[in-house]
């Protein structure tokens, strides 16, 4: 990251590193004007923290950021909808820090927003496996925001669903079927109201997905 930003202040880096015995694996996406010598940088880092870099085998698998992901970062959702305010022109990825806790607000003893997100993802899997929405791809995720009155959930404020799809779909029809077959059916305790904001693929096109577009480790993601 440091070297990429030194060479190109506008660089984008999403890289995972795994170390096991005498092997170092570096994988991910880098978009940078300069060519980075990853093995050399890894050896320098190993030496800096007190290891002999000659004892390690280094394997790097780096490619450019997915064009679908880049499309959401290059230009924000608001900008794509015509908002020219300076503070909304730059897009952003969907990185976040997630935490959880036990609670009595659901049968699963999990926070209701997480329960709804799990249900949506489960229904996405079912719709893909059963072929109910044939345009679906295997990659996807969901996030739900619930408004509370004290400790009591009151209404669903926002639902975000990013799901891989085949190219050339009818977006409006696709979104409506997702809402009726997946999203609405997952939210039972609190119904979606007219003020609930539902965002489906807010970054735009999501044709490139899975390992072809993203790099990740089990239980750990940038």
Where are the language model's segments positioned?
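Glycine-rich, mobile lid/loop segments that gate access to catalytic sites or pores
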Residues: 21-22, 47, 55-212
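Short glycine/threonine-rich loop-to-helix capping motif typified by GTGT followed
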Residues: 28-36, 204-221
């Amino acid at each position: 990251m440091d070297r990429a930003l030194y060479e190109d202040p506008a660089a984008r880096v999403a890289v995972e590193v795994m170390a096991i015995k005498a092997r170092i694996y570096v994988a991910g996406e880098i978009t940078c004007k300069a060519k980075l010598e990853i093995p050399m940088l890894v050896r320098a880092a190993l030496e800096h923290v007190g290891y002999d870099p000659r004892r390690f085998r280094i394997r790097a698998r780096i490619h450019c950021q997915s064009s679908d992901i880049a499309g959401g970062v290059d230009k924000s959702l608001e900008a794509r909808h015509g908002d020219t305010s300076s503070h909304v022109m730059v897009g952003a990825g969907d990185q976040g820090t997630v935490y959880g806790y036990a609670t009595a607000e659901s049968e699963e003893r999990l926070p209701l927003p997480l329960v709804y997100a799990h249900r949506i993802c489960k229904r996405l899997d079912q719709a893909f496996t059963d072929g109910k929405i044939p345009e679906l791809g295997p990659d996807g995720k969901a996030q739900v925001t619930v408004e509370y009155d004290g400790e009591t959930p009151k209404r669903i404020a926002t639902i975000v669903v990013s799901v891989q799809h085949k190219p050339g779909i009818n977006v409006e029809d696709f979104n409506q079927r997702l809402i009726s077959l997946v999203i609405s059916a997952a939210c039972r305790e609190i119904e979606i109201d007219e003020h609930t904001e539902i965002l489906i693929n807010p970054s735009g096109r999501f044709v490139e997905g899975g390992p072809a577009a993203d790099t990740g480790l089990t239980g750990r993601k940038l």
